[in-house]
Amino acid sequence: MRNVIRRVTTMTFTFLLQSPPLPISPSPPQFSLSSSPLSKTQRFITPSQGSRLRTLCTKVIIPNMQDSGSPPLSYLTQREAAEIDETLMGPLGFSIDQLMELAGLSVAASIAEVYKPEEYSRVLAICGPGNNGGDGLVAARHLHHFGYKPFICYPKRTAKPLYTGLVTQLDSLSVPFVSVEDLPDDLSKDFDVIVDAMFGFSFHGAPRPPFDDLIRRLVSLQNYEQTLQKHPVIVSVDIPSGWHVEEGDHEDGGIKPDMLVSLTAPKLCAKRFRGPHHFLGGRFVPPSVAEKYKLELPSYPGTSMCVRIGKPPKVDISAMRVNYVSPELLEEQVETDPTVQFRKWFDEAVAAGLRETNAMALSTANKDKKPSSRMVLLKGFDENGFVWFTNYESKKGSDLSENPSAALLFYWEILNRQVRIEGPVERIPESESENYFHSRPRGSQIGAIVSKQSSVVPGRHVLYDEYEELTKQYSDGSVIPKPKNWGGFRLKPNLFEFWQGQPSRLHDRLQYSLQDVNGNPAWKIHRLAP
């Protein structure tokens, strides 16, 4: 077994490296590097309209039933769970493989929400002979595609085509299958996550070999917690194996999973779950079923395949860290012009699916050197500088009138990248501000008139009332005048720093500084210690 694991772990399984190369448009539509005036040729940045990365799970907090004032949450009996399955696969037309695929994807999405592959890459899925085991096989396949390194222990294989097909799919991905005999004695040394997919809500009686021994081994891992030794986290699919479906772990000697992924709706035993992470998956319950069984369940936001139930665990902020895995940032590989290098990174961030790639932290200081920061949106850039728009009488506008220097910070988490830019700031010509103002949606134009930015208002209703009044005033489509105190700023860079996160905090930092070379300005690249 150790040789199998050793062979597989020599391969690099990170999400970034498994994904296809990020497409970079040779002629990005968001901006231009033309040296012509901004108002004539530089196209402003617009939000990305699509992404090839989809959110599979979004954290939504639903307080526990025990908490006062919490919303109701339904729990199913064993009989109700079976009836719902029969209804789904009967008159409602669902197939078993369809439900299994959705359930397994929900389990994988829940795991990926909490246990990132950079730190929890080695996953052992222990699968039973029934539908719960099938969910585990599907989850393992999705985890492989998410960048994890799954191993499968499937001691009692089912000969039905559905299950043999799932095995074939995993074989085609070279996912290793490990027998019970080949499992290491100490699971804590070879695995970071163990998926308990042995038994589901239809299980009765006591577990039989080899599952009784496997359950005991998972229970024994909990002893590591008492000795503060590192141990794999346990994720149970729908029911912690060995628990009574309704009464839970009534002898208090069973598996105590770190995560429970309830499917369709939580079963009664989930009331006794005390782990830090409880998720709901299986986004396929039709309204007719919810109404018949009076199901009160949290909503799945957006395109999410799972949703958190209960309060998230308390977090030790000092222990929060990410082990970055990224390509190296080398001097010989970057562009000599930092604006061109920024454009390349910006394109890659857009292609990676960031929602607001142009969001940046703008830091200013007033005449007394008192700093202030806020998030704003970059609206254009070229070799002449980086442009954003605001109210000149706002806090940032006031700071820049007193001290016309600023720093910008872009943070693109999904790529482990940051870019810092510093330099003097000036107002852009009024004509450019006028042109951009009238390119905005009419609602935004009216909003700029309504908002005397950073001034005190007695209530939100004041803004709404003025907005409604102006909307009626300009409902005929007439030109909305740009406020005199509204316009753009341009930062002319004299320093860039490109930061790429790396393992063990040995990050790459390349700084471009503008220097005088033979009477001409030139960019000099230095590597900075992390």
Curated annotation (Swiss-Prot):
Main location as per UniProt: plastid
Q: Name one GO molecular function term.
A: pyridoxamine phosphate oxidase activity
Q: Which GO terms describe its biological process?
A: NADH metabolic process; NADP metabolic process; pyridoxine biosynthetic process
Fill in the domain comment: Most plant PPOX proteins have both a pyridoxamine 5'-phosphate oxidase domain and an extra YjeF N-terminal domain.
Annotated positions binding substrate: R321, V322, N323, Y324
An example of a Gene Ontology cellular component annotation for this protein is: cytosol
Give the E.C. number(s): 1.4.3.5, 5.1.99.6
Name the pathway it acts in.
Answer: Cofactor metabolism; pyridoxal 5'-phosphate salvage; pyridoxal 5'-phosphate from pyridoxamine 5'-phosphate: step 1/1; Cofactor metabolism; pyridoxal 5'-phosphate salvage; pyridoxal 5'-phosphate from pyridoxine 5'-phosphate: step 1/1
Residues that hold K(+) according to the record: N132, D196, S241
Provide the binding site for pyridoxal 5'-phosphate: E247, G248, D249, H250, V325, S326, P327, K379, Y436, R440, S444, R505, L506, H507
Q: Which family does it belong to?
A: In the N-terminal section; belongs to the NnrE/AIBP family. In the C-terminal section; belongs to the pyridoxamine 5'-phosphate oxidase family.
Q: Which UniProt keywords apply?
A: Acetylation, Chloroplast, Flavoprotein, FMN, Isomerase, Metal-binding, Multifunctional enzyme, NAD, Nucleotide-binding, Oxidoreductase, Plastid, Potassium, Pyridoxine biosynthesis, Transit peptide
Q: Which residues form the YjeF N-terminal domain?
A: 81-297
**Does ATP-binding count among this protein's keywords?**
no
Reply yes or no: does the keyword Mitochondrion apply: no
The record's cofactor note says: Binds 1 FMN per subunit.
Q: What else is known?
A: Mutants with reduced expression of PPOX1 (RNAi) have lower levels of total B6 vitamers, a reduced growth and are sensitive to high light.
Name the chain's protein: Pyridoxine/pyridoxamine 5'-phosphate oxidase 1, chloroplastic
| Record: transit peptide | 1-64
Required cofactor(s): FMN; K(+)
Q: Which reaction is this enzyme known to catalyze?
A: pyridoxamine 5'-phosphate + O2 + H2O = pyridoxal 5'-phosphate + H2O2 + NH4(+); pyridoxine 5'-phosphate + O2 = pyridoxal 5'-phosphate + H2O2; (6R)-NADHX = (6S)-NADHX; (6R)-NADPHX = (6S)-NADPHX
Induction summary: Circadian regulation. Up-regulated by light, heat, jasmonic acid, ethylene and abscisic acid treatments. Down-regulated by drought and salt treatment. Not induced by UV irradiation.
Q: What does this protein do?
A: Catalyzes the oxidation of either pyridoxine 5'-phosphate (PNP) or pyridoxamine 5'-phosphate (PMP) into pyridoxal 5'-phosphate (PLP). Involved in the PLP salvage pathway. Has a higher preference for PNP over PMP. May also catalyze the epimerization of the S- and R-forms of NAD(P)HX, a damaged form of NAD(P)H that is a result of enzymatic or heat-dependent hydration. This is a prerequisite for the S-specific NAD(P)H-hydrate dehydratase to allow the repair of both epimers of NAD(P)HX.
| Localisation | Plastid, Chloroplast
